[in-house]
A protein has these predicted regions:
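Short, solvent-exposed beta-strand/turn "edge" segments of beta-rich domains on protein surfaces
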Residues: 47-53
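N-terminal structural segment of carbohydrate-active enzymes
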Residues: 2-35, 41, 53-82, 87-236
Length: 236
């Protein structure tokens, strides 16, 4: 199979309905094991709206962390205030330093918007990091590679990702199992560490312990330029 077959399909801005329903259930059952604190900007706990001109960048930052040593990831979910949150857009946060993460978005049309934050344990990123350390130390075993195949199976069963990702995951699992049948540890390892697989599992992997910031923050998109937008984060 060509590596192009593993490329995740271009995701739509909005979550798919099937994905949204599944994640809505996860929100309801979430243990909130990933903490989301110190969200900025937010005025009086969300009582007043942040103001931005259309097209003007809005940088959101937060402290995001969890217990243990697992890798985590997070995303800003945002959209028109009158739109079902399951249809909001999603933008991945970037790690800054310590527990601080941030992301920058903008709004194309004037009007009321809202945003919130979701975060989860990224078991694939955790596996990738730990497997590299073990391989570098000459201690990689079949157990780590069995775990890798299980991650791919769970991703395939999750229903996440854009159309076509499930087919790519099935082909990935087929390749991994062929390497395993030949006892080819290096083939499995190299495939799971490839950029194509990383992108695929970022798009379609399981979001373990999916947690959500309680509530959502209002944003008002002004038409044209807002010369005193910095003040709008301090005063209603």
């Amino acid at each position: 199979m060509a590596d192009a077959d593993l490329q995740p399909k271009k995701p739509k801005k909005a979550l798919k309905a099937k994905t949204a329903e599944g994640e809505a259930l996860l929100f309801a059952l979430a243990e909130d094991r990933v903490a989301i604190e110190g969200v900025e900007p937010e005025i009086d706990g969300g009582r007043f709206a942040i103001k931005r001109a259309t097209g003007e960048p809005l940088t959101v930052s937060a402290d995001i962390f969890c217990d243990g040593h697992d890798k985590i990831d997070a995303a800003l979910i945002y959209g028109p205030a009158n739109l079902d949150p399951s249809k909001w857009s999603e933008a991945r946060f970037e790690f800054v330093t310590n527990d601080r993460w941030q992301v920058t978005v903008s709004f194309d049309e004037p009007g009321p918007y809202r945003y919130s934050i979701i975060a989860w344990r990224d078991l694939y990123a955790t596996w990738r990091d730990e497997a590299k350390k073990k391989r570098d130390a000459g201690k990689l075993t079949d157990l780590e590679l069995i775990e890798a195949r299980e991650l791919v199976k769970k991703a395939g069963a999750s229903g996440r990702g854009a159309k076509g990702d499930q087919r790519a995951l099935a082909k990935l699992l087929e390749r991994l199992e062929k390497h395993a049948a030949k006892g080819d540890q290096d083939g499995q390892y190299q495939l799971m560490q490839s950029e194509e697989v990383t992108q695929l599992l970022e798009a379609a992997g399981v979001r373990t312990n999916l947690s959500r910031y309680p509530g959502s923050v209002p944003v008002w998109g002004d038409r044209g330029r807002a010369p005193f937008s910095a003040w709008s984060e301090s005063f209603p």
